[in-house]
Amino acid sequence: MEGSEEHGETSKAPLSRGVSKGVSILDVILRFVAIIGTLASAIAMGTTNQTLPFFTQFIRFKAQYSDLPTLTFFVVANSIVSAYLILSLPLSIVHVIRSRAKYSRLILIFFDAAMLALVTAGASAAAAIVYLAHKGNARANWLAICQQFDSFCERISGSLIGSFAAMVVLVLLIFLSAIALARR
């Protein structure tokens, strides 16, 4: 009977190692997805501008992301998160090779949570501005600008998608790292 218990324990060890390796590979893939989301959001927002043509050459109306500090914060936040994710890739690849690395997973959980907070702050603040651009605010006499600056509004609205997707991916990365640590 003892021999069968020992055999059962040894047969679970390779399975556990395989699951840990699968979690580590999924971690690398999700980091690539988050990089694409945050980088695309930062680029889309950072290159957004629109000038309205009028009859005279002296009067021009222009909308740029840099006109609003909140959208500038969005670009900076997504750029920082994207840079962090790129720099964390080698550490994530180390987890594929050495799935027993405990302290580096703790470091990744800590920084992933910090980056989740940063991207959430940037995306939430930008979402409020995008809402105001589309709807305006009658009480404050802020008019909606999206009827005039339609291309500008489409791009700033679209850039939010990648950022919110990166938020979901960062939550998944934190859960994956926590699961990998709990299995130890």
UniProtKB/Swiss-Prot annotation:
PANTHER family, per database record: CASP-LIKE PROTEIN, CASP-LIKE PROTEIN 1U1
Q: Spell out which residues lie on the membrane's Cytoplasmic side.
A: 1-24, 94-105, 181-184
Q: Which organism is it from?
A: Oryza sativa subsp. indica (Rice)
Task: Recite the UniProt keywords alphabetically.
Answer: Cell membrane, Cell wall biogenesis/degradation, Glycoprotein, Membrane, Transmembrane, Transmembrane helix
Q: Which InterPro entries match?
A: CASP/CASPL, CASP_dom, CASPL
Q: Please state which protein family the record places this protein in.
A: Belongs to the Casparian strip membrane proteins (CASP) family.
Which coarse location class applies to the principal site listed for this UniProt protein? membrane
Q: Which GO terms describe its cellular component?
A: plasma membrane
Topological domain (Extracellular) residues are 46-72, 127-159
Q: Where in the cell is it found?
A: Cell membrane
Q: According to the lineage, what is the superkingdom?
A: Eukaryota
Full protein name? Casparian strip membrane protein 3
Q: How does it assemble?
A: Homodimer and heterodimers.
Any GO BP annotation: cell wall organization
**What is the role of this chain?**
Regulates membrane-cell wall junctions and localized cell wall deposition. Required for establishment of the Casparian strip membrane domain (CSD) and the subsequent formation of Casparian strips, a cell wall modification of the root endodermis that determines an apoplastic barrier between the intraorganismal apoplasm and the extraorganismal apoplasm and prevents lateral diffusion.
Q: Which Pfam families match?
A: CASP_dom
Please give the residues the UniProt entry marks as glycosylated.
49
Membrane topology is: Multi-pass membrane protein
- Sequence intervals crossing the membrane: 25-45, 73-93, 106-126, 160-180
